[in-house]
Amino acid sequence: MIEVLAFPTPNSVKVPIALEEMELDYRLVPVNLRQGEQKTDAFKAMNPNAKVPVLIDRSVPGDGDVVLSEPAAILVYLAEKTGQLLPKNGPHRGKVFEQLVFHASGLSPAFLQAFLVANQSSPQPEAQARAIGG
């Protein structure tokens, strides 16, 4: 059985989407970031960075549980496990990795920054006026 520890974030939703596309059975385990559940010792034993998502694959015979914590690594692991969604070689495989890296290093940090500015900073009317050309 595959378990996905997650919270409704752009990074977390990538994993269940892939699992659904691959038609793999999994169990979604909610981790409440607002209550700090990702900062517990038990969670940090799975991911010392205290971030979601975390994937636990208990279906690997003889190897014990596979525990992964970075969305791109999880997606590549699932693709290679199933032989789906990732070309075996060639330029199309490169394009998939290009998108994975873009999401990990460009898009996800930008979403986080926008969220923090919108939800955790005080209003700055002068900056807002400059941004809209006022």
Question: What are these regions, as identified by a protein language model?
Answer:
Residues 1-130:
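GST-like domain detector, emphasizing the conserved glutathione-binding G-site
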Residues 133-134:
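Aromatic-anchored helix/helix-loop segment that forms the rim or "lid"
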